Amino acid sequence: MGLTLTLTDADLPASPAFIEFLHATLTGEAYHAGSWYQQEEESLASNEGRFENIQEKAHAVVADPKGKEHLLRSYRFFKELLTGNVHTLRDLARFRFFFVIGIPRTGGTYLTKQLFRAGGINYTTVQNALAHDGFPHLARLSFKEQGNVHTNGLLQLAEYLTMVEVFFGEHGRLAYRGGIIVPKKFTKAVYYFDLLRELFEANADYLVTLRHPLSTCRSVLDKSGGMPADGKFAVRSTIERWTLEDWLHWGVGEEQLRQMDYVECFLGYWKRFHFQMAMAGIPSMPGTRLVPYGAESMSGAAKKLYTEFGLKMEPEAFKTAEPPRFSGDQERAAQQAVEEVAGFWRSLGLAFPTEALAAKL
């Protein structure tokens, strides 16, 4: 037709985390790892003040020929994600992705760390955006203050894939089934799994972490400041914000949500997350492994991976928590949520490990 559509970086600017990564790569500075690998602090990390000088770093990245090349590479990936005409994205076939998928506080951080150890990479030095949840921010479609969440999410995915090329192209040493191992904790993969499946086809494995909703809820509370005094839902941490977003998607207003019982609110999020996981087809993928929460299960899964990789090493110890204490009504509500998820999975021909989760409650 002869039409030309123009989008500039003013319309779709590079993400601060991506600029930060490129700047550290070019200058040799330490990556911003934050505390993603510390289970006790997970989900409480703050970015306040982190990107204050991001404009200076952006100018430095653009002024560097290599930095500009990486930026252009990310936008090229983005264009292919938008159009579906995949060419340069095929270069990613040299990587073997290990996506660790599960609702937060289910042991995914532990498995991600053990995968980095397998590759001989010190996980405390890996930028949090490269290793952990939150980036890319793939979420349900909405138009927010920052624009189209879907489009921005695709750009961040393109940036993440560029980061993979840069970081693992230099530091990746361990190969498995023809590809360099790339670990990624990716909670939000449940919302965009079709995209991952299209991109990586047979070049990905999925470690699905599962945990009883009450022990998960207790862990979220412990990392978010404890149960609110009135027992009502509150947003103080990243995980609680994701819980809020889930309910908003289902048509429940924020004011109404803040009047809901905290446990009831979290159970709704937990239940729908696992419904979505099943509907996405994640549990039925050939490369999927279900890993119930617990020291024996988690360390056993890591040990099995090491054996498959041909490594003679032991996984780190897995930290467990004391059994949670909730009221009888809350326990019954949680049991109903588990039964509903198990029944839904069963209707799709999938087996939900109910007994394994109850044993580690």
Region spans (language model):
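Conserved, well-structured beta-alpha core segment at the onset of a catalytic domain
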Residues: 1-7, 82-98, 164-201, 323
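PAPS-dependent sulfotransferase catalytic core
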Residues: 1-166, 227-260, 314-361
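A structural signal for short, well-ordered beta-strand segments and their strand-loop junctions
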Residues: 99-102, 122-126, 182-185, 205-210, ...
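PAPS-dependent sulfation machinery
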Residues: 113-192, 199, 233, 242-255, ...
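Compositionally biased, flexible interaction segments
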Residues: 120, 151-152, 300-304, 318
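Short, charged, surface-exposed secondary-structure boundary motifs
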Residues: 132-136, 216-220, 323-324
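PAPS-dependent sulfotransferase catalytic domain
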Residues: 188-315
